[in-house]
Amino acid sequence: MQAWKDYQSENKDRFLEELLGLLRIPSVSADSKYKADVARCADAVKEHLLKAGCDKAEICPTSGHPIVYGEKMTDPKLPTILVYGHYDVQPPDPLNLWTSGPFEPEIKHGKINARGA
């Protein structure tokens, strides 16, 4: 457990920058004008999976937005663990309620303010 805590502490700044980078991508899936941004975010998630040590990461096309799939095999005798999440966001409207740009993350009082955070 201590090794994990040390790893997290040593990499906290990098993890934060990677998260902020994803939050800067306007991956609004409900609006077709953001289709390229959703695809760009899918690519970024795939690259993060590979960088994190996944043996395999791929983008699976669908009739809508792509699915990003990754796997890490450590021991085939162990049970499978599934982690499910989403990389898209809802539209940021109404924009006048934002104190900063919804895709310009900022940290205030220890909390990240951005669409998708």
Predicted features and spans:
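Acidic/His- and Gly-rich active-site-bordering loop/insert found
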Residues: M1-A117
